[in-house]
Amino acid sequence: MAAELTSTKLNAENHLLLDQPLLRLPHELARRNFKSVQRLVEREREYVIHALKEAANASLSNDQTPDQTLAALDSMLARMQNLKRKMESIQQEEKKIQNQSRKRIQHLEHLHQIPSLADVKYDQWSRIRLDRLVVDHMLRSGYTESAQRLAQEKGIEDLVDLDVFVQCQRIAQSLRRGETKDALRWCNENKAALKKSQFNLEFELRLQQYIEMLRTGDRGKLMDAMAHAKRYLTPYTETQSKEIHRAAGLLAFPQDTKAEPYKSMYSFDRWNHLSDLFIRTHHELLSLPSSPLLHIALSAGLSALKTPSCHSAYTSSSSNSLSTATSVCPICSTELNELARNMPYAHHAKSYVESDPIVLPNGRIYGQQRLLDMSKKLGCVETGKVKDPTTGEIFDESEMKKVYIM
């Protein structure tokens, strides 16, 4: 009895390992909002203090007329009003983030109030988490409208990162269309954070602009490309010298060249590379997992259940799908068999073998008594016959051979 209670006891901490991004992203967004406010206030403070000193000195020295002094004060007031509007907008965003964090903390707190895996409340909580994982997967796959509708239908808008992924997919799609404007604007907004990134997104975007100028073959564009490289590429000489040298060599090759690496640099496939690079950079800056959480959850479950027989020559999902009584093993199912193929096998320290194992002519091994009982329950075989519960094949009882394990 004690062992049974232990096996059904809910360990909330282990369950929450998968849900760390649920709180990490709002925290990261709140931190970025605070940094934005800090930069705005510092910039405007420096401007106003400097402008006040100039206006006061000019007024005392009679270098300005009263109208000019009033105009300077009006300019400062206008800037402060503009700062107020920006801070009000940021405050609204901050309230939204705080509300999301509150809802997410409440969702996670509910798990600590569930004592057992057998509790009906755990099924309800797990269903909400599954809905979250599905929405997350859909957002990452680009199905933003479907993800939004599912989140609204399930009432979990505050538990998923709709706005973040919608913006990410919008910019990624613009790059696939051959546009760099939105991505460069995003880089400018996150310039400070990008300095710590392991990826070189802004350099790659500027390099692509340079390539597009050369692609035209126009002499005027050639001069623009050289000026562009001097302004935007040369600051990266210390870290990207190899790529800059290649970019310089590109001046001597037309867009239809067969010479590498210039052929690859002119290739339109670079836009897909830039789109993928942006997504990786975006997720890194916001501390988002590189893989969908649904994949991570599935990988753990698949590895825990997978055995060598799931992908053996005698077991295939296609044969299972044709049988009237399919295997209960999820790894052997048509939906998950290929997905689990590259997963590691489960670590089984103990083996559990039937006390009366027999082997059928098709090579499958079962417990004799359990096989006979199942054949009787199915009620679709003649006397003296047995049915393989996995493949549906029928054999004579005399064809069963006893198995001895050494």
Swiss-Prot record:
One GO term of the biological process aspect: negative regulation of gluconeogenesis
Database matches in Pfam families: CTLH (PF10607)
Subcellular localization, as worded in the UniProt entry: Cytoplasm; Nucleus
Family that this chain belongs to: Belongs to the FYV10 family.
Keywords: Cytoplasm, Metal-binding, Nucleus, Zinc, Zinc-finger
Protein name: Protein fyv10
Positions of RING-Gid-type zinc fingers: 329-391
Keyword Transcription listed: no
Function: Involved in the proteasome-dependent degradation of fructose-1,6-bisphosphatase.
A GO molecular-function descriptor: zinc ion binding
Gene Ontology terms: cellular component: cytoplasm; GID complex; nucleus
InterPro entries the UniProt entry points to: CRA_dom, CTLH/CRA, CTLH_C, Fyv10_fam, LisH, ZF_RING_GID
Domain annotation LisH: ranges: 126-158
Native source species: Neosartorya fischeri (strain ATCC 1020 / DSM 3700 / CBS 544.65 / FGSC A1164 / JCM 1740 / NRRL 181 / WB 181)
Domain (CTLH): residue spans on this chain: 164-221
